[in-house]
Amino acid sequence: MTNSLDKKVALVTGAGRGIGAAVAQRLAASGCRVILTARSSDQLDRVREQIEACGGEALSIVADLTGDEDVEHLVQQAQTWGPVDFLINNAGWGKRASVVRADVADWDQTFRLNLRAPMLLAKLLLPAMIEKVAGAVINIGSVSGKRGEANGAAYSASKFGLIGFTQSLYEEVRENGIKVAVILPGFVDTPLIPPNKQLDRSKMIQADDVAHAVHYVLTSPPTCCPVEITIRPQRTPYR
């Protein structure tokens, strides 16, 4: 038997497009009340309108998660439907550059968005979940968090850190009935991946594949928690 998501409140970061939008749409279709957040109001409004057109409930809140004040304000605004049941930390950013040539300011932004923001959001939202003895924190990581690559040191390090955070948080709150998981997709076909003649995008992981994994965690039996899920393409997308 799976858990009902009807009327559960889900906060999805980076929900304006790509994986975040797909997660928000799938959860709304499953009955969740979805709070969308990103930096672009236009993108958020488009996703919210798509959800509402299908009969779902959604609220959009513009926020820059690299700033603590924005994060705290987001958490306050997210109480519209009551305490948040599910936190989906999807927002992420990275700029490719060698360690020698990288701008340290880019490192700071990468770590603040990819690691610090998920930790701060969890810190602020978990007390209500602990009180209810129910809830979930799902972090969208990357296979780059399992194996580093050249010119991606900060991004990989932030995703390695996200895995460590997930594992630690799981141990802290597992007895409170709260599911904690990290999903590690490979190359996903989103607007962030530029056109490349060597890539067959139809064979790439799709955003909804990741959304399906999120839904799987949230509806898994209360006796188990899929703490880490790696998603790889079934067939190689390289021509």
Residue ranges of model-derived segments:
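Conserved glycine-rich cofactor-binding loop
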Residues: 16-17
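Conserved glycine-rich Rossmann-like NAD(P)H-binding loop of the short-chain dehydrogenase/reductase
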Residues: 32-46
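Substrate-binding pocket helix/loop in short-chain dehydrogenase/reductase
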Residues: 98-99, 106-111
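Residue(s) in the substrate-gating loop at a strand-loop-helix junction
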Residues: 142
